[in-house]
Amino acid sequence: MAKKVEKVVKLQIPAGKANPAPPVGPALGQAGVNIMGFCKEFNARTQEQAGLIIPVEISVYEDRSFTFITKTPPAPVLLKKAAGVEKGSGEPNKNKVATVTKDQVREIAQTKMPDLNAADEEAAMRIIEGTARSMGITVE
C-alpha cells in the first residue's frame, strides 16, 4: 500500500545552497523531516544549476520520510539572467530596464515548458513575453 502524505511543503531555494538555517530549517522542522538529509540530497541534485533559484515541492509522509520534486526556475529569474539585470522595473509601463530577443524568450519557454500550462511552444512564449512586459523588459 502507498504511504500516506501528511504534509506538502513548497519552498524556493538557491540551487546547491540548501542549509538548515531559515527558511529551510523551520519549514521542514515543523513537518518532522530530517533536515540535513534533505539539504544534502537537494544540493547534490541541483549543483549543476548554481546561481538559480529552484522551486521544490517536498511531500512528507506519515512515517516522517519524504520525497521531493524540483521544478524549473521561475520565469522572472530566467528573464533577469537573460537580460543581465538585477531586478525588474518599479514602473514597467513607464521605465523599461532591458531588452531580450525572441530567441532568448523561446529558449526560456522551452526550459519552462514542463511547468507551464501551455499547449505548445508559441503559447509558452506568450506567457514568458507577458512576464517580461510586467517586469519592464521589452521583447524584440
Swiss-Prot record:
Record's function text: Forms part of the ribosomal stalk which helps the ribosome interact with GTP-bound translation factors.
InterPro entries in UniProt: Ribosomal_uL11, Ribosomal_uL11_bac-typ, Ribosomal_uL11_C, Ribosomal_uL11_C_sf, Ribosomal_uL11_CS, Ribosomal_uL11_N, Ribosomal_uL11_N_sf
Record field: transmembrane: none
UniProt organism field: Staphylococcus carnosus (strain TM300)
Lineage start: Bacteria, Bacillati, Bacillota, Bacilli, Bacillales
Coiled-coil ranges per UniProt: none
Alphabetized GO MF terms: large ribosomal subunit rRNA binding; structural constituent of ribosome
Subunit record text: Part of the ribosomal stalk of the 50S ribosomal subunit. Interacts with L10 and the large rRNA to form the base of the stalk. L10 forms an elongated spine to which L12 dimers bind in a sequential fashion forming a multimeric L10(L12)X complex.
Entry superkingdom: Bacteria
GO-annotated biological processes: translation
Post-translational modification: One or more lysine residues are methylated.
Family per similarity comment: Belongs to the universal ribosomal protein uL11 family.
Gene3D superfamilies: Ribosomal protein L11, C-terminal domain (1.10.10.250), Ribosomal protein L11/L12, N-terminal domain (3.30.1550.10)
NCBIfam families noted in UniProt: L11_bact
Protein's name according to its UniProt entry: Large ribosomal subunit protein uL11
Keywords: Methylation, Ribonucleoprotein, Ribosomal protein, RNA-binding, rRNA-binding
